[in-house]
């Protein structure tokens, strides 16, 4: 169980060849008693992107601020604050910050526990 504020959770710089200019926070996870889902907040800087990948579990994405694209199985869709995506099992996907103003692309991403990459806990 948890009741908290996102500002009190550590922002982790995700270092990988698959990511560029991405930071994340784990908001809800098994560490606070969630045994089914993990909720993460990602911040993607200008020119940054998440990994271009697929996996055997669904993703739920909600964009909080910024501009970018979500690519789903090779098709790009524009995203902005209020945009959301359901990414089914096996769908190749990537989020990219396309802004030229320096604004962050911030989004919430919810996955099953087995889909969490294990940072920031």
Language-model regions: role of each:
Residues 1-36, 120-121:
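A short, N-terminal "cap"/entry segment at the start of jelly-roll beta-barrel domains
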Residues 25, 40-55, 89:
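Conserved short histidine dyad/triad with adjacent acidic residue
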Residues 30, 49-55, 96-98, 120:
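Short histidine-centered beta-strand/loop micro-motifs
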Residues 33, 89-116:
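Ligand-binding loop in jelly-roll beta-barrel domains
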Residues 43-45, 54-70, 110-112:
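Short, conserved beta-strand element in jelly-roll/cupin
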Residues 49-51, 69, 85, 89-95:
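Histidine-centered metal-chelating micro-motifs
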Residues 58, 77, 93:
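Glycine-centered loop/turn positions within well-structured domains
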Residues 75-89:
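Short acidic-glycine-tyrosine-enriched beta hairpin
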């Amino acid at each position: 169980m948890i009741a908290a504020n996102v500002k009190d959770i550590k922002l982790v710089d995700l270092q990988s060849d698959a990511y560029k200019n991405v930071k994340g926070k784990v908001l809800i996870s098994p560490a606070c008693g969630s045994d089914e889902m993990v909720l993460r907040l990602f911040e993607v800087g200008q020119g940054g992107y998440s990994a271009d990948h697929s996996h055997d579990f669904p993703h739920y994405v909600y964009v909080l601020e910024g501009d970018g694209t979500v690519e789903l199985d090779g098709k790009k869709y524009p995203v902005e604050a209020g945009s959301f995506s359901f990414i089914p099992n096996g769908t190749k996907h990537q989020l990219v910050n396309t802004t030229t103003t320096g604004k962050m692309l911030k989004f919430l991403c919810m996955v099953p526990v087995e889909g969490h990459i294990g940072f920031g806990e």
